[in-house]
Amino acid sequence: MVRLTPGSSRHIMLIYTVVQNVEDAASSRGQPFDYVLLCVKALPDVYNLADIIQSVVTPQHTCILVNTTNTLGVEKQLEERFPTNVVLSLVSGASLTQLASSEFEHSGSTDVWVGPANLDSKIPQSIQRDMSEALAMTLSTGHVDCRVSDNIRQQQFERMIGYDSRSSAFVTKY
């Protein structure tokens, strides 16, 4: 848990449980997880994210939230594996600079956007929207400036390539 002190940059982090792997997390809890947050580099050629989180995802219950700040299209694999679970994307406006081997500085916008990864999911858009709004409200109570996006792909593209089109053109498939 990260708690922000209003009006300051002071953070308080409380860690309730530390586990060595996902299976240990699954066995350490007697009830299903409401959210699974993936903050990893998506390397689908190296490993399958769906395989890794399978033991902590409860069908029709767990919301899978993927930090897609620097990626595109990684949610599809999760939606195919967990068709009855809402998969949301999270895009952060913050920049991260490594100052030393274990020292990092956050700068830039603190805005966070969440929204359904794919609107053509098997899950109704109203349910995806409700989950997005519930998560945004939860994060807002912790003083995180979180907004619900109706088009999360827009935030992903803006974050990855910037707001202008002066850079070279590229083609992507998702």
What are the residue ranges of the model-derived segments?
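Rossmann-like NAD(P)(H) cofactor-binding subdomain of soluble oxidoreductases
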Residues: 11-105
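Glycine-rich phosphate-binding loop and adjoining beta1-alpha1-beta2 segment
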Residues: 1-13
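Flavin (primarily FAD) cofactor-binding/catalytic cores of flavoenzymes
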Residues: 2-5, 22, 51-57, 79, ...
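Internal alpha-helical scaffold of NAD(P)-dependent oxidoreductase catalytic cores
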Residues: 84, 101-174
